[in-house]
């Protein structure tokens, strides 16, 4: 699974936990105002977009949701907490 993470200055153990769940490719963009939303692209082959809501600009969140929808890539909006994120990931797996 290839995951694009947007937001959070540092992922900490979240990156390790995602790799343990089978993520072979992890791309991280910090998500604050330093991202140009016109140039924001989802890498080819991305299976999931994860947006850390505590650390992301609202305009970036809207832009990434729209882009992901056009590419039929699922998006998860989550706090930067592994407990909260794992619950969201479980909900997505049950829907699949």
Enumerate the language-model features and the residues they cover:
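Ser/Thr/Gly-rich flexible loops in soluble cytosolic domains mediating phosphotransfer, phosphorylation
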Residues: 68-96
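Redox- and metal-dependent alpha/beta enzyme cores, enriched for Fe-S-associated oxidoreductases
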Residues: 1-23, 37-38
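A short, well-structured beta->alpha microelement
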Residues: 24-41
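Short glycine-rich, flexible loops that bind phosphorylated cofactors or substrates
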Residues: 57-60
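Glycine-rich, N-terminal phosphate-binding loop of Rossmann-like dinucleotide-binding domains
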Residues: 53-54
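Short amphipathic alpha-helix with an adjacent loop that forms part of the alpha/beta core around
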Residues: 38-43, 89-93
């Amino acid at each position: 699974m290839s995951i694009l993470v947007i937001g959070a200055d540092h992922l900490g153990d979240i990156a390790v936990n995602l790799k343990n769940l089978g993520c072979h490719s992890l791309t991280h963009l910090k998500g604050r105002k330093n991202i140009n939303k016109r140039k924001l692209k989802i890498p080819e082959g991305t299976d999931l977009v994860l947006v850390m809501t505590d650390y992301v600009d609202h305009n970036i969140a809207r832009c990434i949701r729209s882009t992901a929808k056009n590419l039929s890539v699922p998006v998860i909006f989550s706090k930067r907490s592994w407990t909260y994120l794992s619950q969201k990931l479980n909900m997505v797996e049950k829907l699949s």
